[in-house]
Amino acid sequence: MMINEQIRAREVRLVGANGDQLGIKSRNDALDLAANLNLDLVLVAPNAKPPVCRIMDYGKFRFEQQKKEKEQRKNQKVISMKEVRLSPTIDEHDFNTKLRNAIKFLEKGDKVKASIRFKGRAITHKEIGQRVLDRFSEACAEVSTIESKPKMEGRSMFLVLAPKNDK
């Protein structure tokens, strides 16, 4: 952002410190006006014809901008991906344990990647793995939405579940 002497335009549309329009002035007049008020002349819209400048305390403005950015970064939620590994021949109790963990992750706001690794000749029966993943996604349906359908990648099949937004 250009301030004071960095502004090269001959004429500028001037906006006062309290937001009122002061009209089109020469750059030097605008600089003098800002200097008399002990404030800075800041170029806010360089592409306008003529460019728009505002009289303000630039140090205070920068401080406010940094404060806003810091607040936005603080309010950003980092969504992490948790993985739950299943097998095509998973027993009922193991399935329920994995399901409880996945639901806990989803309620916390994390995404869940449910994956099945096919070992040996089990890869010839992909439909069994497909059924396990379908059952898993149906069991998590109350707290999640399917972000990506089950798909094969090498010897693994996986699907991604995202938490539901109940806002």
UniProtKB/Swiss-Prot annotation:
> According to its record, what are the GO cellular component terms?
cytosol; membrane
What single Pfam family name could you report for this chain, choosing any that match?
Answer: IF3_C
Q: Which domain of life is it from?
A: Bacteria
Q: Which GO terms describe its molecular function?
A: ribosome binding; translation initiation factor activity
According to the record, the segments passing through the membrane are none
One Gene Ontology term from the biological process aspect of the record: ribosome disassembly
Keywords recorded for this protein, A-Z: Cytoplasm, Initiation factor, Protein biosynthesis
Q: Where in the cell is it found?
A: Cytoplasm
- UniProt family annotation: Belongs to the IF-3 family.
Relate the protein's function as given in its record: IF-3 binds to the 30S ribosomal subunit and shifts the equilibrium between 70S ribosomes and their 50S and 30S subunits in favor of the free subunits, thus enhancing the availability of 30S subunits on which protein synthesis initiation begins.
Which PANTHER family does UniProt cross-reference here? TRANSLATION INITIATION FACTOR IF-3 (PTHR10938), TRANSLATION INITIATION FACTOR IF-3, MITOCHONDRIAL (PTHR10938:SF0)
Quaternary structure and interacting proteins, as annotated: Monomer.
HAMAP family noted in UniProt? IF_3
What NCBIfam families does the database record attribute to this sequence? infC
Stated name of the protein: Translation initiation factor IF-3
| Organism annotation | Bacillus anthracis
Record gene name? infC
